[in-house]
């Protein structure tokens, strides 16, 4: 039907007769001469037709998004008529034959216009996908999947599918449940990850497994979350953390070659505690400086009882400083007010600061600090004339969070972030357990191997867990797993999953661990998030062919939707009103 894609045609084809096919991107009638920009997956080429052509009458019928097959002769555009914005901007095709394969209703959205309301774009997603940008995104997505398969296969990994219909083990996010017609009153769950099955594959001697896995989580949505998503999932036997990290680094190095980036290995490693204390985040963006500085000891003798009491409780509370170079000339009073309102959203009671001016140090904190305290702050933060030092004080968790967010906000405001940089980081030595209202739960998941399980302070127990971070975004992570039944039971006990409940939920895993499970570990990388970062897309929805909205619905198909009474009866379900 066609001899060339649109952008395959160039000056070397001048004089040749070729056939192209695609959609009418734009249509123009200039004094009887018809110009059509034809679009296919590769890009655009201009078709031209005057009244002397036998295709002229057909060309007059063409409108936006009509499906066309065109035959014609390639010629150079006239002097001064070239379009440098197009790859084919120096040539055009003089129409000899034109077939309208299909007509189109007037499109409700302009193809490729990102300013169109997103809900409308998602409702007509099949039109939205016609944009050249969308094609490039999914072309890259396909390439990355192929690179992943080839790279891991070369390292001895087997691609193995794990079940989609699985057992509900509600830990963390809610499961999507599927009622069983055969087993009345019982349900399957869609997998939140292949975690337990890939561990069982290691017990089964598969040694190295991977899949590009579909996962499902019924959780509140954010800009970078979807109820169904894809991850690069892998597991290895007889390995330690360094082995797993090495595989991930090799894989990411190969993947980023696809967009022309050379990334160096090994990636920097940072303990979780250092990341939180210095950057207020377990996924710090290191494309810019601005570390948080601990200055609690500078407030020990403060005349403000609130600050001095916080300084005397370093286990549970923090006083953190953020020195912003040159900010005194850049931040007006209104900007300072905006920053205060910003941190209040995250639990701050206010935002104290010191302005380092030529005629002295100004700010509401000055009167509460001794001369020694002020001197120590300047030394610790490296503050000079023209700088502003911001302070956060109070509960450790709250302060680290809002000061970390302030760090990012300031960097964005002052344009300190190199948008073209790629800064990879491993965050390691995560806490094994986190405190909740009802005791403790596993910070990653309860199948992670702890480092020091006998530690008297449960909050000091660390995990053999690791996250890979790119530019402040968690790409993925993993851990070394528990491979002995006794240790698995011990971890369950720590998070109040006692024997009976453990057997009910995870009895099949505990049974498997009795039969010589090898040491093993693995990782998962968020595939959608990876593609979002590689393409610099604004939303994860841009890199998924048919995404859900932030209300977990599909505007294209109107899913989820009600089902009829007969279907409900077959599934032994009665709805309560």
UniProtKB/Swiss-Prot annotation:
Binding-site positions, ATP: 217-219, 226, 474, 526-529
UniProt keyword list: Aminoacyl-tRNA synthetase, ATP-binding, Cytoplasm, Ligase, Nucleotide-binding, Protein biosynthesis
Recorded catalytic activity of this chain's protein: tRNA(Asx) + L-aspartate + ATP = L-aspartyl-tRNA(Asx) + AMP + diphosphate
Keyword Transmembrane appears in the UniProt entry: no
Cytoplasm listed as a keyword: yes
Gene Ontology BP terms: aspartyl-tRNA aminoacylation
Compartmental location: Cytoplasm
Site, Important for tRNA non-discrimination: residue positions: 30, 80
Region of interest (Aspartate), residue spans: 195-198
Enzyme Commission number: 6.1.1.23
Residues at which L-aspartate binds: 171, 217, 444, 481
GO MF annotations, alphabetized: aspartate-tRNA ligase activity; aspartate-tRNA(Asn) ligase activity; ATP binding; nucleic acid binding
Assembly behavior: Homodimer.
Described function: Aspartyl-tRNA synthetase with relaxed tRNA specificity since it is able to aspartylate not only its cognate tRNA(Asp) but also tRNA(Asn). Reaction proceeds in two steps: L-aspartate is first activated by ATP to form Asp-AMP and then transferred to the acceptor end of tRNA(Asp/Asn).
HAMAP family per UniProt: Asp_tRNA_synth_type1
Entry protein name: Aspartate--tRNA(Asp/Asn) ligase
Lineage: Bacteria, Pseudomonadati, Campylobacterota, Epsilonproteobacteria, Campylobacterales
Gene name, Swiss-Prot/TrEMBL: aspS
């Amino acid at each position: 039907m066609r001899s060339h894609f649109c952008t395959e045609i160039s000056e070397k084809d001048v004089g040749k007769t070729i056939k192209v096919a695609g959609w009418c991107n734009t249509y123009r009638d200039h004094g009887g001469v018809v110009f059509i920009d034809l679009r296919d997956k590769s890009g655009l080429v201009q078709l031209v037709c005057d009244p002397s052509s036998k295709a002229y009458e057909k060309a007059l019928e063409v409108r936006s998004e009509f499906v066309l097959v065109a035959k014609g002769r390639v010629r150079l555009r006239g002097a001064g008529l070239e379009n440098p914005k197009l790859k084919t901007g120096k040539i055009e095709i003089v129409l000899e034959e034109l077939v309208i394969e299909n007509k189109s209703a007037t499109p409700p959205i302009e193809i490729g216009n990102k300013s169109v309301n997103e809900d409308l774009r998602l409702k007509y997603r099949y039109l939205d996908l016609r944009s050249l940008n969308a094609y490039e995104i999914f072309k890259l997505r396909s390439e990355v999947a192929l690179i992943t398969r080839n790279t891991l296969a070369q390292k001895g990994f087997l691609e193995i599918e794990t079940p989609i219909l699985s057992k509900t083990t509600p830990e963390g996010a809610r499961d999507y449940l599927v009622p069983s017609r055969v087993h009345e009153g019982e349900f399957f769950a869609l997998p939140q990850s292949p975690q337990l099955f890939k561990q069982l594959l290691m017990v089964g001697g598969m040694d190295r497994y991977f899949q590009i896995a579909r996962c499902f989580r019924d959780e509140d949505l954010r800009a970078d979350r979807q109820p169904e998503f894809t991850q690069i999932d892998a597991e290895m036997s007889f390995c330690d953390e360094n082995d797993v990290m090495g595989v991930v680094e090799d894989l990411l190095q190969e993947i980023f070659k696809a967009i022309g980036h050379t990334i160096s290995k090994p990636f920097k490693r940072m303990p979780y505690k250092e990341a939180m204390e210095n950057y207020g985040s377990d996924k710090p963006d290191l494309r810019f400086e601005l570390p948080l500085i601990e200055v609690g000891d500078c407030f020990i003798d403060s005349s403000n009882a609130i600050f001095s009491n916080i300084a005397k409780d370093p286990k549970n509370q923090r006083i953190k400083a953020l020195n912003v170079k040159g900010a005194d000339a850049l931040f007006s009073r209104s900007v300072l007010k905006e920053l205060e309102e910003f941190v209040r959203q995250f639990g701050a009671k206010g935002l104290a600061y010191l302005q380092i001016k030529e005629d002295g140090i100004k700010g509401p904190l000055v009167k509460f600090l001794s001369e020694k305290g002020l001197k120590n702050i300047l030394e610790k933060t490296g503050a000079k004339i023209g700088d502003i030092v911001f302070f956060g004080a109070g509960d450790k968790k709250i302060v680290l969070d809002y000061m970390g967010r302030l760090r990012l906000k300031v960097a964005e405001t002052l344009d300190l972030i190199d948008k073209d940089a790629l800064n990879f980081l491993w965050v390691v030595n995560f806490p094994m357990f986190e405190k909740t209202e009802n005791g403790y739960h596993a910070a990653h998941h309860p199948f992670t191997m702890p480092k020091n399980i006998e530690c008297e302070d449960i909050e000091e127990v660390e995990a053999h867990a690791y996250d890979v971070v790119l530019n402040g975004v968690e790409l993925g992570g993993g851990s070394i797993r528990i491979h002995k039944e006794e240790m698995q039971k011990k971890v369950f006990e720590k998070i109040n999953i006692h024997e009976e409940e453990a057997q009910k939920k995870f009895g099949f895993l505990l049974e498997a661990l009795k039969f010589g499970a090898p040491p093993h570990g693995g990782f998962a990388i968020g595939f959608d998030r990876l593609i979002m970062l590689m393409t610099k897309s604004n939303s994860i929805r841009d890199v998924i062919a048919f995404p859900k909205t932030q209300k977990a619905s599909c505007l294209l198909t109107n899913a989820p939707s009600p089902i009829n009474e007969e279907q409900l009866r077959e599934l032994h379900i009665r709805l309560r009103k």
